[in-house]
């Protein structure tokens, strides 16, 4: 039997999952996306060449990997086709390697328009979405009025569903937000054209994955965003619109939860966040340490281009993420960004309303008032960039990683020491 591995982010996204997934696909026959949409930006660097994927699983660059987009993903057909064409222009036969669940809810132009209109109306209180229609598409899914990929293959069915949907959303756009409305015929024609192109790529994803498991192929489930952005367990309402935890891998692809063998949590050696919301260990952009992390780590979002907020490693939040996901191992990324710092700080608790707290508050209002309690550790002057053996790391770097293991309660299985796939230390292979 093969091994089924789930990769999830343990922070607020941008942990470096794309590179690690790409590295792990050497041992995976199938790579599956199970939630989110094209709001996720996975950056891969292979032989110095950078590729940013938003929807298609990172394994698409592997010749022998089958890539799957599961039913838990909200699908922008336009964005997907654009990504497919970009890959084909680079000589990657994406259509041959990609299969998509026909049950995927679609992101339509009205969802993007609603996303922008809402953020504009909220002003300074805006959540800081990517503006790509993810939230409104998930809303329609839950409200049972959404259009699915399979609807694009049936003109009359699509016309009826789309007409009802646009009547609803155009009313809100026009009378509530004072925003332009969507033209029914234009949206219908575009959707039908997308359906023609995507129909050959559809498959029963649950059945496909189950069949692959029976043949003994390893399967990698690729998460997007991060645990602290989970719609239920994250810093609500400053979260994404899907379940980003490991449990969603089963529901978002149609396989049973007992088929998941190993859960790998990706975390930076420090912490970053894009958009609004509480961030206890945040450092100011003009702070010397905050500037170091931002500049050395090239902390700009792959999807939005926004500068990421940077701070020290938060062991309290990561420990909670480890519990929610039942992590088997941690992968620490961007360790090399900490090179040259004299002192490193680890958040080991919070001081909330005068009391010491060692767990992550569930209410965002309480978390916003929390002050980090730090434990200082000595840094290292040596470069860790490109190191591929754990024993070759500086002694203080190994001590830092060991302390993270103790605080989070999960072994460090992998360490990334640079953006290239080869700049990776493996202590325990998930496969």
Swiss-Prot record:
Record's InterPro entries? Adenylosuccin_syn_GTP-bd, Adenylosuccin_syn_Lys_AS, Adenylosuccinate_synth_dom1, Adenylosuccinate_synth_dom2, Adenylosuccinate_synth_dom3, Adenylosuccinate_synthetase, P-loop_NTPase
**A Gene Ontology biological process annotation?**
IMP metabolic process
- Group of enzyme by EC: ligase
Which residues are substrate-binding?
302-308
Its annotated pathway reads:
Purine metabolism; AMP biosynthesis via de novo pathway; AMP from IMP: step 1/2
Positions with a binding annotation for GTP: 13-19, 41-43, 308, 334-336, 416-418
- The answer to whether keyword Amino-acid biosynthesis applies is no
What cofactor is this protein dependent on? Mg(2+)
Indicate the residues that form the catalytic site. Answer: 14 (proton acceptor), 42 (proton donor)
Q: Could you say which residues bind IMP here?
A: 14-17, 39-42, 130, 144, 225, 240, 306
GO CC, sorted alphabetically, is:
cytoplasm
- From the Swiss-Prot or TrEMBL record, state where the protein is found: Cytoplasm
Catalysed reaction equations from the record: IMP + L-aspartate + GTP = N(6)-(1,2-dicarboxyethyl)-AMP + GDP + phosphate + 2 H(+)
Cofactor comment in the record?
Binds 1 Mg(2+) ion per subunit.
Q: Which domain of life is it from?
A: Bacteria
**Its quaternary structure?**
Homodimer.
Family that this chain belongs to? Belongs to the adenylosuccinate synthetase family.
Q: What does this protein do?
A: Plays an important role in the de novo pathway of purine nucleotide biosynthesis. Catalyzes the first committed step in the biosynthesis of AMP from IMP.
Q: What name does the UniProt record give this protein?
A: Adenylosuccinate synthetase
The protein's gene is named purA
